[in-house]
């Protein structure tokens, strides 16, 4: 007689084994109809599996986070059901849930097209309308092998090979189609309604390019039609803002096959990069950082000593010279310790903050590369703070202020903060972990910040705080971080002399605000849709001549503006002024200044903003004053 305890503390007693669906039915028919699965003693369980003992039960519906993930996973199986009905010689690989959706990797000699996506989607809709029950079969490993051998599902058989002999394997039966999964899944297809197949891409079995080439079908699914439509609108907007398209359209950068994952910056894009670097450099100087520059290629012996050679060797680019192996640095920290180690340091010298715009290289898989967002060569706004244990909290607190100041400058007000604490495998004493975690916690709490704890997610050498931005499309980008490190100063012999004249190892704080310049610029391109605020824009103002008579005045104004430090350009082509204004607008120039006979007479310009607002008549001093004010605000609205 299982006693079931519900979330409100109430108990229900059943005379025999009971399923989640039966528990829901005992509460009400409406709840039973909405039930997708359940959580039994904090473990997700299919709605139709019997519960035999006293348990705490939570009923899962589409309103729950777990419910929508189950819906998405069930849709992945529906892809399998549909393609197996439509195409021959299809072999199913894996079909997991991902953020906002799902995908299925499929092996087929036939190459799917966008037209096939429509065909598959139509078949899925047809299957859904039959409202069939999804049966769960819990079988032994031997029986699972037999099932998939009969169906010639070679990839499923490979997955089964890695499953232990003991225990049962969950098979899910969609009419004639059978798939394998940890589960749970929906009990009936009536729970599967609002979905869209999105795109096709290539992949490899288990992500290894030496394995079979697969075809991936992506989809999304939501509990409500409005949620689906809102998501599709966000995708459409994201495609419109895609930094790769805008980068090409506005001549910001390009990437080519001869140098995959490495950026060719064009003058417009490089201007943005330089302005961003200048801004961060100002911030660093204001906060007492010392800027350094370290070598690109370093003998592997340093990487062996730091531990990176053992852990990251496959991700490093290497070269050889005079019988020595060098690694092109994937990170800056070991080199920064070499700078710290030059000369004797006293506790009175700490904290020492060393910063570098460090160019790093990592041998990312070619399939993972994505425009500016995932590259092989990137520049970090990297810094390392060498301090005592007692100084951790103050340094972290100051850094948090710095992060919020910078992000606010770019219009990011919603910052997600996560604190990751000690993992099972770690270096350092429990005492120093206690001190460090307490310091990070206090630094956050003293600022009344909302943050999320991630127990056990810290690095083996220390706890960390991560800062993520939420952009205009509600996408989350992890950019900033501050990481406590007890290990590397010891490994690389970094020491200072304490108050008792004893040598001690400093604590090292790894920290970055932007993460990488490339990725952050990619985020900004999409956030602004290439409509950069005036301080960041490649060209801040363009001067347009109405007739040939006004060309000389345009050129003179332009020269004066450039000599005063503004990024100005001219359009003196023999075109109609309306056409020139449209061109300047399409080029996203923040300020458009028109000079005709009337303006020339009074030595002024007619000024308009990118959004079409008429700003009035400005002579050169007033124009400079206006631009200075806008540039000083750096896009801030307050």
UniProtKB/Swiss-Prot annotation:
Cofactor(s) this protein requires: Zn(2+)
EC number(s) given by UniProt: 6.1.1.3
SMART domains: tRNA_SAD (SM00863)
Subcellular compartments: Cytoplasm
Keywords from the UniProt entry: Aminoacyl-tRNA synthetase, ATP-binding, Cytoplasm, Ligase, Metal-binding, Nucleotide-binding, Protein biosynthesis, RNA-binding, tRNA-binding, Zinc
Main location group: cytoplasm
Residues annotated for Zn(2+) binding in this entry: 333, 384, 510
Stored InterPro entries: aa-tRNA-synt_IIb, aa-tRNA-synth_II, aa-tRNA-synth_II/BPL/LPL, Anticodon-bd, Anticodon-bd_dom_sf, Beta-grasp_dom_sf, TGS, TGS-like
Keyword Repeat tagged: no
First-level EC class: ligase
Cofactor binding description: Binds 1 zinc ion per subunit.
A cellular component annotation (GO) from this entry: cytosol
Region annotation (Catalytic) ranges: 242-533
Gene Ontology molecular function: ATP binding; metal ion binding; threonine-tRNA ligase activity; tRNA binding
HAMAP family: Thr_tRNA_synth
Family the entry assigns: Belongs to the class-II aminoacyl-tRNA synthetase family.
Subunit structure comment from the entry: Homodimer.
Task performed by this protein: Catalyzes the attachment of threonine to tRNA(Thr) in a two-step reaction: L-threonine is first activated by ATP to form Thr-AMP and then transferred to the acceptor end of tRNA(Thr). Also edits incorrectly charged L-seryl-tRNA(Thr).
Protein's name according to its UniProt entry: Threonine--tRNA ligase
Organism: Prochlorococcus marinus (strain MIT 9215)
């Amino acid at each position: 007689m299982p006693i079931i305890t519900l979330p409100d503390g109430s108990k229900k007693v059943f005379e025999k084994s009971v399923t989640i669906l039966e528990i829901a039915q005992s509460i009400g028919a409406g709840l039973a109809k909405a039930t997708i699965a359940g959580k039994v003693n904090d473990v997700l369980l299919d709605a139709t599996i019997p519960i035999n003992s006293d348990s705490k039960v939570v009923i899962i519906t589409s309103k729950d986070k777990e419910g929508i993930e189950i819906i998405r996973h069930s849709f992945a199986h529906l892809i399998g059901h549909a393609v197996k009905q439509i195409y021959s010689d299809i072999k199913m690989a894996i079909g997991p849930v991902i953020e906002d959706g799902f995908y299925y990797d499929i092996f087929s000699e036939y190459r799917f097209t966008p037209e096939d996506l429509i065909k598959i989607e139509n078949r899925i809709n047809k299957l859904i309308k039959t409202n069939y029950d999804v049966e769960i079969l819990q079988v032994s490993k031997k029986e699972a092998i037999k099932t998939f051998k009969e169906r010639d599902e070679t990839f499923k058989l490979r997955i089964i090979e890695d499953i232990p002999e003991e225990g049962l394997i969950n098979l899910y039966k969609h009419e004639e189609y059978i798939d394998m999964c940890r589960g749970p899944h929906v009990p009936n297809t009536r729970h599967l309604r609002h979905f869209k197949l999105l795109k096709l891409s290539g992949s490899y079995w288990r992500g290894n390019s030496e394995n079979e080439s697969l075809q991936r079908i992506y989809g999304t699914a939501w509990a409500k039609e409005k949620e689906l439509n809102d998501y599709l609108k966000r995708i459409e907007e994201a495609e419109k803002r895609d930094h790769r398209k805008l980068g090409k359209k506005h001549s910001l950068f390009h990437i080519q096959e001869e140098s995959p994952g490495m950026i060719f910056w064009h003058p417009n894009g490089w201007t943005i990069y330089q302005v961003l670097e200048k801004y961060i450099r100002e911030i660093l100087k204001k906060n007492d950082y010392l800027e350094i520059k370290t070598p690109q290629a370093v003998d592997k012996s340093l990487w062996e000593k730091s531990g990176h050679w053992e852990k990251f060797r496959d991700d490093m680019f290497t070269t050889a010279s005079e019988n020595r192996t060098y690694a092109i640095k994937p990170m800056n920290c070991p080199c920064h310790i070499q700078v710290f180690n030059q000369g004797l340091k006293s506790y009175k010298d700490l904290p020492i903050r060393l910063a570098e715009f460090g160019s790093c290289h990592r041998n990312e898989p070619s399939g993972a590369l994505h425009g500016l967002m995932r590259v092989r060569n990137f520049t970090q706004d990297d810094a390392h703070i060498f301090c005592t244990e007692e100084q951790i909290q103050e340094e972290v607190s100051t850094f948090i202020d710095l992060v919020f100041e910078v992000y606010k400058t770019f219009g990011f007000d919603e910052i997600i903060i996560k604190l990751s604490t000690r993992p099972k495998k770690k270096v350092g004493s429990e005492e120093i972990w206690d001190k460090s975690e307490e310091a990070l916690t206090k630094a956050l709490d003293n600022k009344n910040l909302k943050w999320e704890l991630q127990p056990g997610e810290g690095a083996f050498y220390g706890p960390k705080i991560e800062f993520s931005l939420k952009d205009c499309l509600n996408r989350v980008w992890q950019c900033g971080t501050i990481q406590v490190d007890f290990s590397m100063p010891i490994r690389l012999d970094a020491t200072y002399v304490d108050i008792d004249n004893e040598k001690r190892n400093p604590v090292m704080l790894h920290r970055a605000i932007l993460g990488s310049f490339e990725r952050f610029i990619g985020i900004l391109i999409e956030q602004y849709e290439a409509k950069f605020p005036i301080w960041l824009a490649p060209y801040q103002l363009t001067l347009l001549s109405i007739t040939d008579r006004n060309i000389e005045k345009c050129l003179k104004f332009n020269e004066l503006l450039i000599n005063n430090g503004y990024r100005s350009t001219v359009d003196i082509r023999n075109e109609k002024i309306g056409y020139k204004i449209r061109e300047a607008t399409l080029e996203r120039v923040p300020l458009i200044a028109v000079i005709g006979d009337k303006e020339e007479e009074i030595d002024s310009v007619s000024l308009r903003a990118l959004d079409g607002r008429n700003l009035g008549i400005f002579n050169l001093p007033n124009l400079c004053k206006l631009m200075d004010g806008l540039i000083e605000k750096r896009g801030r609205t307050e």
